[in-house]
From Swiss-Prot:
GO terms for molecular function: 4 iron, 4 sulfur cluster binding; metal ion binding; pyruvate synthase activity; thiamine pyrophosphate binding. It comes from the Archaea. It catalyses: 2 oxidized [2Fe-2S]-[ferredoxin] + pyruvate + CoA = 2 reduced [2Fe-2S]-[ferredoxin] + acetyl-CoA + CO2 + H(+). Its cofactor is [4Fe-4S] cluster. The gene is porB. It comes from Pyrococcus horikoshii (strain ATCC 700860 / DSM 12428 / JCM 9974 / NBRC 100139 / OT-3). Its EC number is 1.2.7.1. Binds 1 [4Fe-4S] cluster per subunit. This is Pyruvate synthase subunit PorB.
Length: 331
């Protein structure tokens, strides 16, 4: 009988027994990312363990390293909320001086990356350190009480952007850190999602193999902060892709005129010119994504807010060079 090879290594670097919430999308992301990283290290250096992790304070740090226990099965250092990129830069410089072959993986959430860690990240990218920075994006400061971050999407409820008579919730557009990273002319910048795990694995391996800095912004569902059913995390993340709320793209060597777009699926029609995606007609409205999430429930009483969100998503796709056609539920 033929034996099928697993699509990814069975080695574990993010071990079971951590304290993440049931249904945590970020835990899925880190499990897949560390497996993919080890495969890349084995292919590049002949050693699957040729990497170390520098991790910022945040959800995934808190749940993985409650002293004296840890879920990490790889050299790992916990640093402050804002300086995972700086610490990773130092480790990388030390490895280079000592002649150690391998790569550093820096990990931070959206608060520790898009907000208070942005300066350290920019410095790491600009200096050209051989580090992959993985931003797990659950779109708020979930660890400290579901406060809004600059990565929180427009209209979302958080404890610091509550909807009410004079508020629709978060009133700022989402910050796309992957585009900021790409502006540093680094070898590789991308977005990924637990809604497309094979794409996530492929991009982590690609980032790990480049010489120089790389950045990946990974969309992760959060049942606690998003007020979603525990069992629907991957399905909801997939809906974000299929409705246009979360684009999957990659930018190599800062070439923003040649952004590679991963087709969203979900029945969307994709049009290309010269091999480049220029137009996507989405079949599913963004309401299909919003309706599962308690953080957006108030928007269904404010159709003008949903329309504003739809316009912001179109504008984001325009930045990527793509005309996005986003249907309404009645269409």
């Amino acid at each position: 009988m033929a034996v099928r090879k697993p699509p990814i290594t069975t080695r574990e670097y993010w071990a079971p027994g951590h304290a993440a919430c049931a249904g945590c999308g970020c835990a899925i992301a880190l499990k897949l990312a560390t497996k993919a990283f080890s495969e890349a290290m084995e292919e590049k250096y002949g050693d699957p363990n040729a990497f170390a992790i520098a991790q910022a304070t945040g959800c995934m740090e808190v749940v993985s390293a409650v002293f004296p226990y840890t879920a990490w099965k790889v050299p790992w250092i916990h640093v402050a909320f804002e300086n995972a990129a700086a610490a990773a830069s130092g480790v990388e410089a030390a490895w280079k001086k000592l002649g150690i072959k391998g790569k550093i993986l820096a990990i931070g959430g959206d608060g520790g990356t898009a907000d208070i860690g942005l300066q350290a990240l920019s410095g790491m990218l600009e200096r050209g350190h051989n580090v992959v920075y993985l931003m797990y994006d659950n779109e708020a400061y979930m660890n400290t009480g579901i406060q809004r971050s600059s990565s929180t999407p427009y209209g979302a409820w958080t404890t610091t952007s509550p909807p009410g008579k004079y508020s629709i919730g978060e009133d700022r557009p989402k910050k796309w850190v992957a585009l900021i990273a790409a502006a540093h002319q680094i070898p590789y910048a991308a977005t990924a999602s637990i809604g497309n795990p094979f794409d996530l694995v492929k991009k982590v391996k690609k980032a790990a193999k480049v010489d120089g800095p790389a950045f990946i912004q990974v969309h992760c569902t959060c049942p606690t902060g998003w007020r979603t059913p525990l069992e629907k995390g991957v399905e909801i993340a997939r809906l974000a892709i299929e409705t246009g709320m979360w684009p999957l793209f990659e930018i190599e060597n800062g070439d923003i005129w040649n952004i590679k777009i991963q087709p969203p699926g979900g029945g969307a029609k994709v049009y290309k010119e010269g091999g480049r995606v220029v137009r996507i007609e989405f079949k599913k409205p963004i309401e299909e994504y919003l309706k599962y999430q308690g953080r957006f429930k108030h928007l269904f009483k404010r159709p003008e807010a949903i329309e504003e969100l739809r316009n912001q998503i179109k504008a984001m796709w325009k930045v990527l060079g793509v005309e996005a056609i986003l249907p309404r539920p009645e269409e």
